[in-house]
UniProtKB/Swiss-Prot annotation:
The name this protein goes by in its record: Ferric uptake regulation protein
Gene designation: fur
GO cellular component terms listed in the entry, alphabetical order: cytoplasm
Keyword Ligase in record: no
Stretches the record annotates as Dimerization: 91-147
Role: Acts as a global negative controlling element, employing Fe(2+) as a cofactor to bind the operator of the repressed genes. Regulates genes involved in iron scavenging or photosynthetic electron transport.
């Protein structure tokens, strides 16, 4: 599903929230991100500031959390001290391989991971919403610098 302002508005209204200009602007930023790019709250704040969109950092944090709870964004732990976010596109499942030294992140697809997630959630009586695997390791470049 591709999220639009209309679908976001409908989802928010269903849950008793409204589509504010700030929420719509944040959604637009994520829709326009290049594939494979993830933003932290601070990254998003700086991006919006550079576009003269004065949205406070606290509003950004609240909006990111809300959109993640609603399933519009995926919250990612990319081996840094803060979360990153990306647009959740259910038909584009992918996983992350992260270097713990330099934070380089590679996205990859694996039908096996998705099948295991689906099978496990079904076995336990869960309805699968998302399935993601994050692998932490040391990239080849950082391995060479450790020698």
């Amino acid at each position: 599903m591709t999220y639009t302002a209309a679908s976001l508005k409908a989802e928010l209204n269903e849950r008793g929230w409204r589509l504010t200009p700030q929420r719509e602007e944040i959604l637009r930023v994520f829709q326009n991100l290049p594939a494979g790019e993830h933003l932290s709250a601070e990254d998003l704040y700086n991006h919006l500031l550079s576009r003269n969109s004065p949205i406070s950092l606290s509003t950004i944090y609240r909006t990111l959390k809300l959109m993640a709870r609603m399933g519009l964004l995926r919250e990612l732990d990319l081996a840094e001290d803060h979360k990153h976010y990306e647009l959740n596109q259910p038909l584009k499942h992918h996983h992350h391989l992260i270097c713990v030294s330099c934070s380089k992140t590679i996205e990859f697809k694996s039908d096996s991971v998705l099948k295991i997630g689906a099978k496990t959630s079904e076995k336990e009586g869960y309805h699968l919403l998302d399935c993601q695997l994050t692998i932490h390791g040391v990239c080849p470049t950082c391995q060479r610098s450790l020698v």
